[in-house]
Amino acid sequence: MRNWLKAMREKKGLTKKQVATKLSISQPYYYDVEIGSSQTDMAYSMMERLAAAFDVPVQEIIDAEREYMAEKTNTA
């Protein structure tokens, strides 16, 4: 699970549906992204869209995703 993504969404006070709407994707697809089941590696375009939706620098998203992938690799 991408805990960093859930934490960022909750910090902004947004629901999954609200984030999905901001990203112009379906709610089920956003849920899959958040739990990490739909994408092994998150596309840069998705990182840019998340950064815009959460009003944070894209580098913050990149760093969080790198950490997530490193943890995922170390536990595999």
Q: Predicted segment positions?
A:
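A short, Lys/Arg-rich alpha-helix, primarily the initiator
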Residues: M1-K11
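The alpha-helix within a helix-turn-helix
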Residues: R9, A20, A51
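Short alpha-helical DNA-recognition segment
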Residues: L14-I35
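Long, hydrophobic alpha-helical segments
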Residues: A43-M47
